[in-house]
């Protein structure tokens, strides 16, 4: 048991001979939040990223999962930065692995802008 209160409740249930499971299941849940893309050009959403921390990467994956038909592309300030000091994965590698077209801010493809 992780908490003293949990131990107390378990003791009570045990003393009453109530069958139970302690943390026996994992339940999923969704927190409804809004995502505001940086730019929309036609039907394409452009998200700009300088520093790209784990919570932002999780958010982008969640946005893509919730909106699989949207065309979301990422413009990186430094696409070859590693996602963390110990990783070999760069921002651009992460984008490719997760199905996001990407480019560097200084090399935005012209066809993205039409």
Where do the protein language model's features map onto the residues?
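Nucleic-acid endo/exonuclease domains
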Residues: 1-114
